[in-house]
A protein has these predicted regions:
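Catalytic metal-binding core of the metallo-beta-lactamase
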Residues: 1-116
Length: 119
């Protein structure tokens, strides 16, 4: 089922949102990743690589670099790890990513309409 080794943009949004929800509802990081793997929601190879990084003592932010989150998002995660409220930060990142996606879609609609009229 999972052939790609990278998550799509939508999968990254869903992943960070669901992880934030699980953490907010009392799951530990280990429990959340076990849930993701058992439910087969995301590519197991990616999740296992992140899990392995965490077991080796790497920070969550450093582990997320392989998931292609932006440097700004990784910085937010790093600060949340240091100062607390990781769950809320992850939910905020998901909302920000959704907003950017909506703006991108609206921009493409606005640009494509005049081009359609010219053709």
């Amino acid at each position: 089922m999972w052939r790609k080794k990278q998550m799509t943009r939508k999968q990254r949004v869903d992943f960070v949102h669901l992880l934030g929800d699980l953490l907010q509802n009392g799951f530990s990081l280990q429990q959340a990743f076990a849930f993701f793997i058992n439910a087969n929601l995301f590519a197991p190879s990616i999740l296992e690589a992140v899990q392995q990084d965490l077991h080796q003592g790497k920070s969550l932010a450093l582990s997320f670099t392989q998931l292609r989150y932006s440097n700004d998002q990784l910085l937010q995660i790093e600060l949340a790890e240091t100062h607390g409220d990781l769950a809320q930060t992850l939910l905020g990142i998901a909302e920000q990513m959704r907003l950017v996606q909506r703006q991108r879609e609206n921009f493409l609609k606005a640009v494509s309409y005049p081009l359609l009229l010219l053709v």
